[in-house]
A protein has these predicted regions:
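Short beta-strand scaffold segments in enzyme catalytic cores
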Residues: 28-32, 186, 243-247, 361-367
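Di-metal (Zn2+ and/or Mg2+/Mn2+) metal-binding site signature of metallo-dependent hydrolases
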Residues: 272-299
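Cytosolic regulatory regions built on CNB/CRP/Popeye-like sensor folds
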Residues: 468-736
Length: 736
């Protein structure tokens, strides 16, 4: 049901698609015409589908009604790489068909940020006090250099893209080929004959995984310091993923330019989202920021590390793409601004950032942990010959030139890009480096097949099994305490512990490592400990039947402690697991009299009322992670809905939302009275609750029964902690 401000069904793909079309693996429709193929919908890396399937490159791309798939958190209008491919390789413009004039405006805004970069220079506050002005980049001069193509001059958006607007319901794409906009469907007409009908809204296919999502490799343990390469290639390599990393510091990770669907890739290999608490955004090209935006909308709110200059560009770009305001997008993450020339402190280590030499503002960085260091170049042009030419032409100031002509060869490990010139580092320049540097050098942003085998260079290898470990011989100060505090912060009701209570937990926490198959908790025994999972997966088994699994960041054992009752289920290590245990008396003493204990007691009560099973009946809430479901349950309050009881009135500021159990609730809204809502339905004026504005609808109980209420402040906090869930509920008054 999609009217009256309900969300779209998770798998909606528009009307039945018929005719001469092909559904592309990453999403979108490929329609063959007599003049050449046309593609409707452009998901990230779509050009790789065409290359892998050995299809002709489309002569035109149609942007769908919605440019952004909220369910997947991805663009369906990623025209950057099709435009680059057409311009640089095929030597032609990329035709973009837009269904409304406003869409062209939005696309041009995106192009400004991704192709040419933000206007103006960074503020002085983005650099450390005393950082020499002569070392600061002059982005306007550098950008002009990169956007000037020999033989063509200065590149403009219209040199890459030809816009075709649908007016009066139709548009001619090329002579003889017409697109007709029928509202919820698009018709492709070839010389007067309808050859395909496709949905005007393109929903991306569901994520797939070939690996058991709950089992981690038993032999793999996260390094205290190191890098996992998630992707080592570029946007035109059909066999490789775009370049991105996991930077491990203190046994936890920060993502760097994650490829799309990174969370699922890691979960399938036993690395839970709560193991990752930050993302570094190096710049705003689609092969680096598409997965970043997707990650910001998943599970809990995380930290975003970049400069304010790059952040502003990122927000403008994705506001234009998603149709969401910059202010709303800004609330989906915790921004940690980085300053050039000053360290960012992370779990006892340091990150030092620098602006690289690229077509748009881009950062690279050096990471230090204990007595070891790792350098990650970011996209950059390291080519002494070209850099010298830029200096001689007056594009680079002397101090900036000196920074760019040097190579960071002194680090323990160096991950350096070797992409496609002229924007990237030529392999030949890296081949000139000393042999002892090459031994610590890993090439990224390059297809493995393009790395020469005779000059001592090597491509970085993707996957957690190839993690580059740079273990320090001396850990940073307070490393153990920092790690324990990070573990407590993974638990929602412990995240905001006062310092005095956190100190108490530090004193009594116990670390445990158990092999796969070990019983951690036995059904029927007395509950004497509370457990937090640090690494690995556990299986909850009740009366011999597996009922749920928990991963890193999840916890268990609280019910038996609070109720002082026997354990009601077994908990078995599904993989090797690393746990933190808190004894019953220590746990209760640390939380006694706090809001955290109140929330935990509420969770136990709600679980006994069957709330977990109720969430599984809701199309959106069923897809929450176990950690999200647990957090939501700490805010739910069971209540009884009386006959014709009014839950909220039109014109009033609503105070609660509700999850319906065996009651029946009816909504009356400006569109009329809606069908009754029953078990598993979420009802609540989300926008009014978020803004404390008046409700346009009213709700009442039409059949007596049980409900779960959630107070407005608790709902707001849940949405703030889980921005992707908030986007699923944005603009709704019910979710079934």
């Amino acid at each position: 049901m999609t009217d009256a401000k309900g969300p779209p069904p998770p798998e909606t793909r528009g009307p039945a698609t018929v005719g001469a079309w092909l559904a592309l693996p990453r999403g979108g429709y490929y329609v063959r015409t007599s003049a050449g193929p046309i593609q409707i919908g452009i998901p990230p890396e779509t050009i790789k589908d065409v290359m892998e399937l050995k299809l002709d490159v489309p002569i035109a791309y149609v942007l769908p009604r919605d440019l952004f798939d909220r369910r997947r958190g991805l663009s369906v209008a990623e025209f950057e790489f099709p435009a680059y491919y057409s311009f640089f390789l095929l030597k032609r413009r990329c035709r973009l068909v837009v269904l409304a004039p406003d869409v062209e405006r939005r696309v041009r805004a995106i192009f400004q940020e991704s192709l040419f970069g933000p206007t103006g220079e960074p503020l002085a506050t983005e650099f450390a006090d005393g950082y020499p002005e002569a070392r600061r980049p002059r982005f306007q001069r550098e950008s002009e250099y990169f956007r000037t193509v020999p033989g063509r001059g200065r590149i403009e958006a219209d040199d890459l893209v030809e816009f075709i607007q649908v007016k009066g319901g139709s548009a001619e794409i090329v002579p003889g080929i017409t697109i007709v906009d029928q509202g919820d469907a698009l018709v492709i007409r070839d010389n007067g004959k309808d050859i395909a009908v496709v949905g005007a809204t393109v929903s991306l296919p569901s994520r797939t995984s070939s690996t058991d999502p709950d089992v981690s490799p038993a032999s793999w343990v996260a390094p205290s310091f190191g890098v996992t390469v998630l992707g080592a290639s570029h946007g035109f390599d059909p066999s490789g993923k775009t370049t991105g990393f996991l930077l491990w510091m203190g046994g936890r990770a920060i993502l760097v330019d994650p490829p799309t669907d990174t969370t699922d890739y890691l979960r399938a290999r036993g690395i839970a989202p709560k193991t990752i608490d930050g993302v570094i955004l190096t710049h705003c090209h689609a092969d680096h920021d598409a997965g970043t935006f997707q990650k910001l909308l998943e599970e809990s709110q995380i930290s975003l590390y970049t400069t304010p200059h790059i952040l502003g560009s990122f927000l403008r770009k994705y506001s234009a793409l998603s149709g969401l305001s910059e202010d709303l997008l800004r609330r989906t993450f915790s921004f940690h601004p980085v300053r050039i020339g000053a360290p960012v402190h992370v779990r006892g280590g340091e990150l030092w950032f620098k602006y690289t030499l690229h077509s748009i503002p881009t950062i690279g960085f050096d990471a230090f942990y204990g007595n070891r260091s790792i350098s990650i170049s970011g996209d950059t042009l390291y080519d002494p010959k070209r850099v010298t030419e830029m200096f001689e032409q007056g594009i680079l100031d002397p101090a900036r030139f000196e920074d760019l002509i040097g190579f960071p060869g002194h680090h323990s490990a160096i991950l350096h890009e070797a992409g496609i010139p002229p924007l990237h580092t030529p392999v030949a320049a890296l081949a000139e480096l000393p042999d002892d540097v090459k031994k610590r050098l890993y090439l990224v942003h390059i297809a493995a097949k393009d790395v020469p085998t005779d000059n001592g260079l090597r491509a970085a290898r993707e996957g957690i099994e190839h993690t580059i470990r740079v273990e320090p011989s001396a850990a940073p100060r307070f490393a153990d305490a920092i790690e324990l505090l990070d573990i407590f912060a993974m638990v929602d009701f412990l995240r905001d512990l006062p310092l005095s209570r956190a100190r108490s937990l530090l004193q009594v926490a116990r670390r445990m490592t158990l092999p796969a198959g070990e019983h951690i908790v036995t059904q029927g025994t007395k509950g004497d400990s509370f457990y937090i999972i640090v690494n690995g997966t556990v299986q909850v088994v009740k009366d011999g039947i597996p009922i749920k699994r928990y991963r890193a960041g999840d916890y268990f054992g609280e019910m038996a402690i609070l109720l002082d009752s026997p354990r009601n289920a077994d908990v078995v290590a599904k993989s090797d697991v690393d746990l933190v245990a808190l004894d019953r008396n220590d746990f209760l003493a640390s939380l006694r009299g706090s809001e955290m204990l109140t929330r935990l007691e509420r969770l136990v009560a709600v679980r006994n009322e069957g709330a977990w099973e109720l969430l599984a009946q809701n199309t959106v809430l069923a897809h929450l992670t176990s950690a999200q479901k647990t957090q939501l349950q700490t805010y739910l309050v069971p209540c009884q809905g009386g006959p014709n009881e009014v839950l909220w009135r039109a014109g009033d500021i609503p105070k609660k939302a509700y999850l319906v159990d065996d009651a029946v609730v009816t909504l009356r809204c400006p569109e009329g009275e809606l069908k009754p809502f029953t078990s598993g339905a979420f009802v609540g004026e989300v926008d009014a609750l978020r803004s404390t504005g008046p409700s346009p609808s009213s709700a009442r109980v039409t059949q007596t029964g049980k409900l779960f209420s959630i107070d407005r402040p608790d709902l707001v906090r849940f949405f703030e902690d889980n921005p992707g869930v908030y986007l699923s509920f944005l603009g709704t008054r019910f979710v079934e």
